[in-house]
């Protein structure tokens, strides 16, 4: 409308602009009225081209009283129009058509005159305080108790009650209003007991029945289904050293071992490597002080993770791979037995167990000459559908980078400590962080994924299948895994297992979180990092680190001794609360540890992964190798290239630290490029020279197989023993490939190829 009026006014005078009008209709924040400025003098164009003007013939102007009268009428008309127009604009809400016509925009207000300050940026101290406040008002024990009710117990993987709990977790995620909730399903093979009972029998030398020792209630998944007969030999915990210290050979014999110290799968693998024909596992009273001597228990014997019948690839229903079998499956029968059954067997054995074993007085070493043991295992394979449940809080800056927080959901028995606590922590953390985002102004830069895994009891099957399904891309997106399984098993100690990349973050967290019972900060020992234990095969964090190259951490509040009821029917809420009366406080502390991990990893501009920690790991390896310099020299080899690779890695970390120091922290593009280099450090310690299918745990520090640095050292040690077991060809390959893996990690950390200063 205004443009038309101005156009008409201009055309009246032959198109020459004789005046202009400027409006400012925006209401000021301080409440001043809008105003109008009008000029009726002819403004000359100051920047016009004089030569152009000279060539333009201006039309003749009208003259006399008619012309002046016309001007006066138009001026008074415009003044009246403006007064009415502005009066209308004052009567409407901000951001109306008036403002848009005027070309200005007023601040958005909910009520006239009300002042709204801009949202304050939340810093570390703010977020830490908000997390603590939410933790104080959270009832963890109520949720743990709920998950231990009959509708969810027992919840063996693939069962209806496992699915019931999966749907409950999924619904809870939706109620928490996470950014997105989804599930994935896999069809996997597990092993279950057959209708024909497993048995342990004492027989005479002719194989005739003396008496039945036990039909065990528990079993060991992935055992070979077979019947074997032989003498029984005790091998303590079944570690490699335990077998080395035995005076009695175990070839052709059944081995009996105590539970604890290492996984069932490792015990079985050690026994099988020495040609044992079967393994029995029991819980002694010294290490597991359980009153009920008849208590049975469960475990698995797969020396690996995931579905052992789809090794290295995911168990999706639409993939049709040829029949395959993990090399980690045992070829001998394995069975758990009760303590009462073990004592019956000891009654038919001779020789006291060594005093340094520190076990029960009833322990004996080997069956008498007239007796043998017959072991029958009849387990069968069963294909089941499992569900993994996910929820995500999307990041505000880098949503494609995420930290994963996960917990096992299934359990062979009630699973209060084994999976109930972890699932409760997962649900409460998801709820708290969603509230912090929706209500408290928390804006994580990176995404947070909450994952509920199934079939964890069978070797982290659900978690591993997910990793296998996204092997090619996950390391570019997921930069940390936080495991909540078995986070509360006691109160005396705080223990942690993790990638070295997370050591600095763990230390800062321990300096901020207090022990739930003593009230002292968890950080009490400056040398704590040297006492960190390696992630074990039965920990869901292990495949993240060793298979996918994703930094991972697992922690627990626990005792010096093992929690006795894991994998048994006594893993109930009742037993848990009796052993840990301050369960809610301890669960709160565990949630605070995990919560602070999440905040630091998703909020800070610089990724909290300390890549320089691997310098110490490499230096330690080189020092160990230097002890064998003479042997290496005798083979005509040199360590010079290994030294060079380690030096390149050290220089790459120093250069990256300098780059971070020089970077403008507000430049998101630059910071993302630097963070991307840090994210790939762990991944580049996966050996590129072995197949994920044949050797899934490719990490040269934390994996398993001949490609690892510990395996290289073990092979080299055999040369000094001079027993013909040393394999020089293997060692040459190990040294070369280890060197190039370290060099590759250094090159990747350096950045672009033109930034690599390499005279290797």
Swiss-Prot record:
GO terms for MF: double-stranded RNA binding; Hsp70 protein binding; identical protein binding; protein homodimerization activity; protein kinase binding; protein-containing complex binding; RNA binding; transferrin receptor activity
- Superkingdom in the source lineage: Eukaryota
* Reported effect, residue 644 to A: No significant effect on binding to transferrin nor HFE
Q: Which residues carry this modification: Phosphotyrosine?
A: 20
Identify the gene encoding this protein: TFRC
The protein in question is named Transferrin receptor protein 1
Q: What is the effect of changing residue 622 to A?
A: No significant effect on binding to transferrin nor HFE
- Covalently lipidated residues (S-palmitoyl cysteine) read 62, 67
């Amino acid at each position: 409308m205004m443009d038309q009026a101005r156009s008409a006014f201009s055309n009246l005078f032959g198109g020459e602009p004789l005046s202009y009008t400027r409006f400012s209709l925006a209401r000021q924040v301080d409440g001043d009225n809008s105003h109008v400025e009008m000029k009726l003098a002819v403004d000359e164009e100051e920047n016009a081209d004089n030569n152009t003007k000279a060539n333009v013939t201006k039309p003749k102007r009208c003259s006399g009283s008619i012309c002046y009268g016309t001007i006066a009428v138009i001026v008074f008309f415009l003044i009246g129009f403006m007064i009415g127009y502005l009066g209308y604009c004052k009567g409407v809400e901000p951001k109306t058509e008036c403002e848009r016509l005027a070309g200005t925009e007023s601040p958005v207000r909910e009520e006239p005159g009300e002042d709204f300050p801009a949202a304050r940026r939340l810093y570390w101290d703010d977020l830490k305080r908000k997390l603590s406040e939410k933790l104080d008002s959270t009832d963890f024990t109520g949720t743990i108790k709920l998950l231990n009710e009959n509708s969810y117990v027992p919840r063996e993987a693939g069962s209806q009650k496992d699915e019931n709990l999966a749907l409950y977790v999924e619904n809870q995620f939706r109620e928490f209003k996470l950014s997105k909730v989804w599930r994935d399903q896999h069809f996997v093979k597990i092993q279950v007991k057959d209708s024909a009972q497993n048995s342990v029998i004492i027989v005479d030398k002719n194989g005739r029945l003396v008496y039945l020792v036990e039909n065990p209630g528990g079993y060991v998944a992935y055992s070979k289904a077979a019947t074997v007969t032989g003498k029984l030999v005790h091998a303590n915990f079944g570690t490699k050293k335990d077998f080395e210290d035995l005076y009695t050979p175990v070839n052709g014999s059944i081995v009996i071992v105590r539970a604890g110290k290492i996984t069932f799968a490792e015990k079985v693998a050690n026994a099988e490597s020495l040609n044992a024909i079967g393994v029995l596992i029991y819980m002694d009273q010294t290490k597991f002080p359980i009153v009920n001597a008849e208590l049975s228990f469960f475990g698995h014997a797969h020396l690996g993770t995931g579905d052992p019948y789809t090794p290295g690839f995911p168990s999706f229903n639409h993939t049709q791979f040829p029949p395959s079998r993990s090399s980690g499956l045992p070829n001998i029968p394995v069975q758990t037995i009760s303590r009462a059954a073990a004592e019956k067997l000891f009654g038919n054995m001779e020789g006291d167990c060594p005093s340094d074993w520190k076990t029960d007085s009833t322990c004996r070493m080997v069956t008498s000459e007239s007796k043998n043991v017959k072991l029958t295992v009849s387990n069968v394979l069963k294909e089941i559908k499992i569900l993994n449940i996910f929820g995500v809080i999307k990041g505000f800056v880098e949503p494609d980078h995420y930290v994963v927080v996960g917990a096992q959901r299934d359990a062979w028995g009630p699973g209060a400590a084994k999976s109930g606590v972890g699932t409760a922590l997962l649900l409460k953390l998801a709820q708290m962080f969603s509230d912090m985002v929706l209500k408290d102004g928390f804006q994580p830069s990176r995404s947070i994924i909450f994952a509920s895994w199934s079939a964890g009891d069978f070797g982290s099957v659900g978690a591993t299948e997910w990793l296998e399904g996204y092997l090619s891309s996950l390391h570019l997106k997921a930069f940390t895994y936080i495991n909540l399984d078995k986070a509360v098993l006691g109160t005396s100690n705080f223990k942690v297992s993790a990638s070295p990349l997370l050591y600095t973050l763990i230390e800062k967290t321990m300096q901020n979180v207090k022990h739930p019972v003593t009230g002292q900060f968890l950080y009490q020992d400056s040398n704590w990092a040297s006492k960190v234990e390696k992630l074990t095969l039965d920990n869901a964090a292990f495949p993240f680190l060793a298979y996918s190259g994703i930094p991972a951490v697992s922690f627990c509040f626990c005792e010096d001794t093992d929690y006795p009821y894991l994998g048994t029917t006594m893993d109930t809420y009742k037993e848990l609360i009796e052993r840990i009366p301050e369960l809610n406080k301890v669960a709160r502390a565990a949630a605070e540890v995990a919560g602070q991990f999440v905040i630091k990893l998703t909020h800070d501009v610089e990724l909290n992964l300390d890549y320089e920690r691997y310098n110490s790991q490499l230096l330690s390896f080189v020092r160990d190798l230097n002890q064998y310099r003479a042997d290496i020299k005798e083979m005509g080899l040199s360590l010079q290239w290994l030294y060079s690779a380690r030096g390149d890695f050290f220089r790459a970390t120093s250069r990256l630290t300098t780059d971070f120091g020089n970077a403008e922290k507000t430049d998101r593009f630059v910071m993302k490029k630097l963070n991307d280099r840090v994210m790939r450090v762990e991944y580049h310690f996966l050996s590129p020279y072995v197949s994920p299918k044949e050797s899934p745990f490719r990490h040269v520090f934390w994996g398993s197989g001949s490609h690892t640095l510990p395996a290289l050292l073990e092979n080299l040690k055999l040369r000094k023993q001079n027993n013909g077991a040393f394999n020089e060809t293997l060692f040459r390959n190990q040294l070369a490939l280890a060197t190039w893996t370290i060099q590759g990690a250094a090159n990747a950390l350096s950045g672009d190829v033109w930034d690599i200063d390499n005279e290797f």
